[in-house]
Amino acid sequence: MGSSQSVVTALQTVLKQRDLKIAPRTLQNFMKEVDRVAPWYACSGSLTVASWNKLGKELDRKHAEGDLCLGTKAIWKLVKNCLEDEACHPAIIESQGTLEEVQDSMSETERSERMGARKRKDMSKKKGPPQEVKKGGEKEGSYHSPLNKSKKKKKPESSQYPAVELEALELDNSDSDTLDSSEEGGLEEEVARYEEKRYHPDRHRPLKTKMNVRPPPINPAGSRPSAPPPYELRLNTGTDSFLPLEERRKIQMAFPVFENAEGGRVHTPVDYNQIKELAESVRNYGVNANFTTLQVERLANFAMTPTDWQTTVKAVLPNMGQYMEWKALWYDAAQAQARVNATAGRSSGHLTKIVQGPQEPFSDFVARMTEAASRIFGDSEQAMPLIEQLVYEQATQECRAAIAPRKSKGLQDWLRVCRELGGPLTNAGLAAAILQTHRYRDLSNRKACFNCGRMGHLKKDCQAPERTRESKLCYRCGKGYHRASECGIMDSGADKSIISLHWWPKSWPTVVSSHSLQGLGYQSSPAISASALTWRDAEGKQGCFTPYVLPLPVNLWGRDVLQAMGMTLTNE
């Protein structure tokens, strides 16, 4: 009987790991049936899947012969599901050790008695389980009716396990080894619900207890968990999230929420004893003592909110001055960690591509380089030698010349030296602006008027009366209303020929030249033919040239055409 009781204790430990509780009397009846069917299990069995499956085959054989009590197979299924669950592995190892100790202490006489008893039972077995009938028609050892059980039922003791207890199945605690059909069906339903909860956790709804009251905390009195338990999930259909139930439990542990019996979320303050012990440690040993540090580390095991930490520190420190100092340091550490979290893993490109602009201040360039390096390396102080080398190589020539004699002084000294370098207000910037202004002024004075031909103003600003066009066609070309003396002016000293925009076909393409024209007038970025043109004279001579196209009243033939014709410019 002692070995069977040890197996019952081991089974209770395994079932409690899955929040299942079966009455000890029911497990004892189950082990009696196991000892009758397979007495070898108490001697050499183990809490392994292979050994339990072997026991299941023995039970199936007896069930096929009609020699198995009701409810035995259902309890076997519950234990098998627990053995296959990885969450029950620690409890299984502990129970297996207890079972092995009992088996080792079992004498050879007891072993032989168990095996001999099995042989005697096998020889005297019948087709059905032995039952004796009393005069009243009631079978001996049978369970009482539900009506009688309600009268004899004792007040259940308060359990410290929040799962649904199997006493809701109304199993009797009598000495009978058999179960009636209703109890067998209830136990089978419990097995089905357990398997549904295990293999389909998202479809499972939390079962309500008899009194519809939130179960008590899991931990027994006197012990404290490492972190507060998360609030209970209230799932509807399981289709509102793609995450499995276990993953959602891990997410909730990041910031636990407490719920009361009605389901409302409440705030649970820090335990008074914890605060009292920490305050006494600070008062007796100081804030830097090892014992005080240990107390703080003990508090760190709990999932405390920022408000909880502030309240706790304010309560344990002796004065508000130390609290304000701690709060300032705490804020600095939180902001530093927030910056690290925000910039970690977000690089802004290659550091070699960050170059100081011509008009960019040296301080802005250093700030861009330091920010990019902190995003890549995390801590910019550790990468400071690399940052200094990149800043020196990719700064402007003026800044490099100022840094070179003080290259070993560090980045702060470089910022001080280059503070006045770069930007539009430097000597180089002012000189460039002055030269640019004088250049534009000189160019404006060298422009010629197309109306009067004088320098210093444009045609739109000319005060002279506008010249009228000739009313007759030119007798030389027969095309334009101009004088013959102005028709196709020959070499005027120009190197390139210029075609009047009036005679240039609109379908011929032009491009903007990168050179400027300067003679009697000035033209910046003039238009030039997009392709070379071919000219041919009356004598059969021909050549190629690329003329400029300007809004002139006449065409100007330059040396690029006249020299090919064999003409030269003389002063005769």
UniProtKB/Swiss-Prot annotation:
Principal EC category: hydrolase
Chain positions of site Cleavage: I92, I93, F255, P256, L299, A300, A431, A432
InterPro entries in the record: B_retro_matrix, B_retro_matrix_sf, Gag_p24_C, Peptidase_A2_cat, Peptidase_aspartic_dom_sf, Primate_lentivir_Gag_pol-like, Retropepsin-like_cat_dom, Retropepsins
Residue positions of the active site: D491 (protease)
Annotated ranges, domain Peptidase A2: 486-561
PROSITE patterns reported for this sequence: ASP_PROT_RETROV (PS50175), ZF_CCHC (PS50158)
UniProt EC number: 3.4.23.-
Zinc finger CCHC-type: from-to: 447-464, 472-489
Ranges annotated as biased composition (Basic residues): 117-128
Pfam families: Gag_p10, Gag_p24, Gag_p24_C, RVP, zf-CCHC
Signal peptide: none
Gene Ontology terms: biological process: proteolysis; viral process
Matching Gene3D superfamilies: Acid Proteases (2.40.70.10), Human Immunodeficiency Virus Type 1 Capsid Protein (1.10.375.10), Retroviral GAG p10 protein (1.10.150.490), Zinc finger, CCHC-type (4.10.60.10)
The entry's keywords: Aspartyl protease, Hydrolase, Metal-binding, Protease, Repeat, Transposable element, Zinc, Zinc-finger
Keyword Lipoprotein recorded: no
Composition skew (Basic and acidic residues), residue ranges: 132-142, 190-199
Compositional bias of kind Acidic residues: 167-189
Entry's Gene Ontology molecular function annotations: aspartic-type endopeptidase activity; nucleic acid binding; structural molecule activity; zinc ion binding
Keyword Metal-binding: yes
Region (Disordered): 99-230
Protein name: Intracisternal A-particle Gag-related polyprotein
Species: Hamster intracisternal a-particle H18 (IAP-H18)
